[in-house]
């Protein structure tokens, strides 16, 4: 009845505000899978050591709502000192995952967008098993290498599984 409608002040504006708050809870990150240029061996991916997580992780960046692929290319180019014209980026998949954030010490909901990056000409120094660029330590690791690393398994197995399912389908 009319009395009940006026008593309950929850309307479409409040609903929209609640939806926007929920959206902010989600942490949007673009994951980057870069395969080692040598295709004869087991597939290896580029990971880096993240000090906040104390773990080797896939390259990742906060997702940009518009022009995310361009943003990913720009960031990979800057991080690895590779000319942007040498980088091809392809969207693979998305997945919403709840996981514990080592850096924030709490469970968080992540919306991961996975991109495959191909670099046409990889700098020779960056083809070594591990290397440092711009102060960041990088490693080439296969999925099975990652699955054998207890620290990666403990902190990031859900992301490893997501990449494995998406890239090896």
What does each model-found stretch correspond to?
Residues 1, 18, 51-65, 124-169:
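Nudix hydrolase/Nudix homology domain
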Residues 83-96:
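A short coil-to-beta-strand element that immediately follows conserved catalytic motifs
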């Amino acid at each position: 009845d009319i009395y009940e409608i006026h008593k309950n002040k929850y309307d479409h504006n409040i609903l929209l505000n609640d939806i926007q708050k929920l959206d902010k809870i989600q942490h949007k990150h673009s994951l980057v899978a870069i395969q080692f240029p040598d295709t004869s061996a087991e597939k290896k991916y580029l990971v880096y050591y993240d000090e906040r997580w104390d773990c080797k992780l896939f390259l990742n960046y906060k997702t940009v709502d518009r022009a995310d692929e361009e943003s990913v290319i720009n960031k990979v180019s800057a991080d690895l000192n590779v000319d942007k014209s040498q980088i091809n980026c392809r969207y693979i998949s998305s997945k919403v995952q709840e996981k514990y954030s080592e850096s924030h010490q709490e469970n968080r909901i992540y919306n991961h967008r996975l991109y495959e990056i191909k670099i046409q000409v990889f700098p020779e120094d960056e083809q070594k098993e591990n290397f440092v660029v711009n102060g960041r330590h990088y490693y080439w690791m296969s999925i099975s290498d990652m699955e054998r690393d207890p620290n990666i398994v403990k902190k990031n197995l859900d992301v490893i599984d997501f990449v494995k399912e998406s890239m090896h389908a």
